[in-house]
């Protein structure tokens, strides 16, 4: 079975906002602190519907993408996050998972 961290990276690379949202629990939390260093505020998204809608818009308007993702371990990956062209080296961390492998909390922080 594919590790959750790999599924997360794959959904970002393929810009599949629906599959990304399905990785989370109904009330899952996605928190991205990297955007704080750009012209945007950090992102705090609660619930799979909010995650789906947010990334749908980000992908549609080419405002978010990733480059050079590398899995560090079963719960972390290093990547370059691009926020509307501004690039940040980042670490994505699966903070909390359910027993069936859904994400309760995921954070993305600058490296």
Where are these regions (language model features)?
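Short, charged low-complexity linear motifs
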Residues: 15-19, 40-41
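A solvent-exposed, acidic/Ser-Thr-rich amphipathic alpha-helical stretch
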Residues: 25-72
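Hydrophobic pocket/interface hotspot
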Residues: 8, 20-21, 28, 47, ...
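Short, aromatic-enriched amphipathic alpha-helices that serve as compact interaction elements
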Residues: 1-16
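N-terminal helix-cap/turn-to-beta initiation motif at the start of protein domains
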Residues: 1, 21-22
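A beta-strand edge to alpha-helix "cap/lid" segment located at domain peripheries
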Residues: 52-111
